[in-house]
């Protein structure tokens, strides 16, 4: 980092709109959460600043329910409308996305073919952002392993900015959630989570744990607290559901 470059906040500090974050020339990607004026970077939101190696910074919104699309992101979308050649998909963004039928079918749609046979309003899909440049709506693709319609399980919503905390550093949090619950869990980058559990009680406990992560994401020691919470909660559930043996008389 150049001697002229300076970051004015420590890692994991809170910034508010108008705060001077840094000064100089930094190789940071475009973001809607800060702006640059005459070599000075200012926060556009109330958020958390992360600093890496003293030379790279990022501003993360503390409260945001909207997802900003990025090409290559894997998302969970909700079919909200049907068009002749594809589907309009809600991706929890200011933009609705479009999924061409040809991406799902692997061929062009035939004249008069009813695409509702493949996806209907209310269905969820796992997809990737294939194209987006802020001048057109995001275009999705479901070509690839693990992509396509979600047939089973539950989809829950969290704030997109909380996704990194639910996954955890080196996937530490998601591994705790998976190993303790035994559920299949997929966290999409737009703040939707697909879960499949053995029963509803385990699912409810897992959802409660994820909501705790979302509300306490800024606190330290959260991973171990979640591990202990699930051990206790699921231990009670599993003991209550275990077959009871009659005492000898």
From Swiss-Prot:
Coiled-coil regions listed: none
Entry keyword annotation includes Aminoacyl-tRNA synthetase: no
Residue ranges of domain S1 motif in the record: 72-143
Domain of life: Archaea
Single GO term (MF): poly(A) binding
Main location: cytoplasm
GO cellular component, one term: cytoplasm
SUPFAM superfamilies named in the record: Eukaryotic type KH-domain (KH-domain type I), Nucleic acid-binding proteins, Ribosomal L27 protein-like
KH domain: residues covered: 151-213
Keywords, comma-separated and alphabetical: Cytoplasm, Exosome, RNA-binding
Gene3D superfamilies listed in its UniProt record: 2.40.50.100, K Homology domain, type 1, Nucleic acid-binding proteins
GO BP, sorted A to Z: CUT catabolic process; exonucleolytic trimming to generate mature 3'-end of 5.8S rRNA from tricistronic rRNA transcript (SSU-rRNA, 5.8S rRNA, LSU-rRNA); poly(A)-dependent snoRNA 3'-end processing; RNA catabolic process; U4 snRNA 3'-end processing
Subcellular location: Cytoplasm
PROSITE patterns: S1 (PS50126)
Described function: Non-catalytic component of the exosome, which is a complex involved in RNA degradation. Increases the RNA binding and the efficiency of RNA degradation. Confers strong poly(A) specificity to the exosome.
The family this protein is said to belong to: Belongs to the RRP4 family.
Subunit structure: Component of the archaeal exosome complex. Forms a trimer of Rrp4 and/or Csl4 subunits. The trimer associates with a hexameric ring-like arrangement composed of 3 Rrp41-Rrp42 heterodimers.
Name of the protein described by the UniProt record: Exosome complex component Rrp4
Gene: rrp4
